[in-house]
């Protein structure tokens, strides 16, 4: 974990924070919903420990060369440390969910930096075209792993609902599909427990979603008032209803499980041993020294 610590210590200049929303206006495009076959959808089953040990090597190819990622991460580290010092709820949320600090910072970086989450999801949607594409052209392996693990840890925390009823608004794109169809978002999809929040992001398509694999991330979001629920790219949904309202589409989706083309793609194809117990805290200990959180 040494390189991870060094990268975080280095720091980067601050830049302005922009609200996370899509650009409004322009012609509406139609895009058909599908199973997002090119999405990188790894769930890292049975390789959590190996993947965590690979993070220092991955940092050399992601944190250092790609300044936007490093800058967003550095700002998230600073903001999380400041939040934890003034807001006991942040500390309680971290301990209550057993969320590793690295995962908390990944969630914060994802929600606070407009350029990062857009560029990241653009890459996630295409990095699954081949394993070679993932290995050599996908420069967000660390962020993908940490977000995936964060959602899993949050969902396993005591008191988290099994399924959540959420909304997602999209501007400028009218999605099409048919009732009964199985689909995936194919990216980390931001949704909200509040319908009015989704409408702020757009109304060209409004998704009303019952998710059973998304997690409530409000305690780790830069915008907690949005009551965000983040859905992983591998969750599948059944289209239950589609309604057209003028130029806008209203689509109901119900969780139908998960589907992944990849598992532990960073490692050669072979049987992987189960992760040993006691991994939780390895990244936490390293990052706590940097952020000054308890």
State each model region's role.
Residues 128-130, 261-267:
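Short peripheral tails and domain-boundary helices/loops at the edges of structured domains
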Residues 264-281:
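C-terminal GPI-anchoring signal of eukaryotic secretory precursors
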Residues 49, 55-211, 215:
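Internal glycine-rich, Lys/Arg-flanked active-site/core loops of soluble domains
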Residues 181-261:
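ADP-ribosyltransferase catalytic core
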């Amino acid at each position: 974990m040494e390189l991870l610590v060094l990268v975080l210590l280095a720091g980067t200049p601050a830049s302005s924070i922009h609200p996370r929303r899509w650009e409004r206006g322009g012609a509406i495009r139609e895009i058909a919903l599908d199973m997002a076959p090119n999405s990188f959808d790894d769930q890292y089953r049975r390789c959590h420990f190996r993947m965590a040990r690979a993070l220092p090597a991955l940092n050399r190819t992601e944190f250092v060369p790609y300044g936007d990622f490093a800058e967003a991460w550095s700002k998230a580290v600073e903001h999380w440390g400041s939040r934890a010092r003034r807001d006991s709820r942040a500390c309680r949320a971290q301990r209550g969910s057993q969320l590793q600090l690295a995962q908390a910072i990944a969630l914060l970086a994802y929600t606070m930096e407009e350029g990062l989450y857009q560029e990241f999801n653009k890459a996630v949607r295409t990095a699954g075209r081949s394993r070679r594409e993932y290995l050599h052209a996908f420069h967000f392996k660390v962020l993908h792993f940490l977000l995936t693990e964060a959602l899993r840890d949050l969902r396993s925390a005591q008191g988290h609902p099994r399924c959540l009823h959420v909304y997602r608004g999209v501007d400028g794109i009218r999605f099409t599909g048919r009732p009964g169809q199985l689909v995936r978002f194919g990216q980390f999809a931001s949704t909200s427990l509040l319908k009015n929040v989704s409408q702020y992001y757009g109304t060209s398509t409004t998704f009303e979603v019952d998710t059973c694999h998304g997690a409530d991330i409000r305690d780790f979001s830069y915008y907690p008032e949005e009551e965000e629920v983040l859905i992983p790219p591998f969750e599948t949904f059944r289209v239950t209803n589609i309604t057209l309202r003028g130029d806008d589409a209203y689509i109901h989706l119900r969780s139908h499980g998960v589907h992944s083309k990849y598992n532990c793609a960073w490692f050669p194809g072979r049987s992987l041993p189960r992760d040993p117990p006691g991994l939780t805290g390895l990244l936490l200990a390293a990052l706590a020294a940097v952020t000054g959180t308890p």
